[in-house]
């Protein structure tokens, strides 16, 4: 299904070799002040990050309604496969949201990483905590994009009848 959809693949070790060949030391570079990633977006790389982001966005969209996100977070291909098989076989689960990361620990534990997953998870969490934006809807760049579609505020989007129907499902 993906033939022709992927041009190249580059892992962290290969990227590290490119930086080394070009004499680029990332730790010596000045931080970019244009980074507008939300806390949730920054946490995607570790197990539980997607669930956290979804929960914060859902609560941002419907602040007056308590929506209990019961996430089941699994990592590793075998665990993901097991959860999918269990669901397909009709096994009950209390979760209403499933997050499956193919790599152990999430992307931070992927193949050819250059630091161990535990250390990478801590770095990802620290990076996330540095964000002053909780959700994408608190990001001025996202609001500019929504404006291009004729949506001037989150409240306006939430008053859209189709969106209300989608979010009102139990």
Show which residues each predicted segment covers.
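Iron-sulfur-associated redox domains of electron-transfer enzymes in respiratory
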Residues: 1-170
């Amino acid at each position: 299904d993906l033939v022709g959809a992927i041009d190249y693949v580059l892992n962290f070790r290969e990227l590290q070799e490119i930086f080394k060949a070009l004499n680029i030391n990332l730790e010596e570079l000045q931080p970019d002040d244009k980074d507008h990633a939300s806390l949730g977006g920054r946490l995607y790389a570790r197990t539980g990050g997607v669930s956290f982001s979804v929960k914060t966005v859902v609560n941002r969209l419907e602040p007056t309604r308590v929506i209990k996100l019961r996430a089941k977070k699994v990592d590793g291909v075998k665990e993901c496969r097991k959860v999918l098989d269990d669901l397909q076989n009709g096994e009950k689960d209390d979760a209403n949201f499933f997050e499956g990361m193919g790599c152990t620990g999430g992307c931070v534990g992927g193949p050819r990483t250059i630091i161990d997953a535990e250390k990478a998870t801590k770095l990802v969490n620290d990076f996330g905590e540095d964000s002053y934006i909780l959700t994408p809807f608190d990001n001025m760049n996202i609001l500019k994009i929504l404006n291009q579609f004729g949506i001037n505020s989150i409240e306006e989007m939430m008053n859209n009848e189709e969106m209300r129907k989608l979010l009102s499902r139990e």
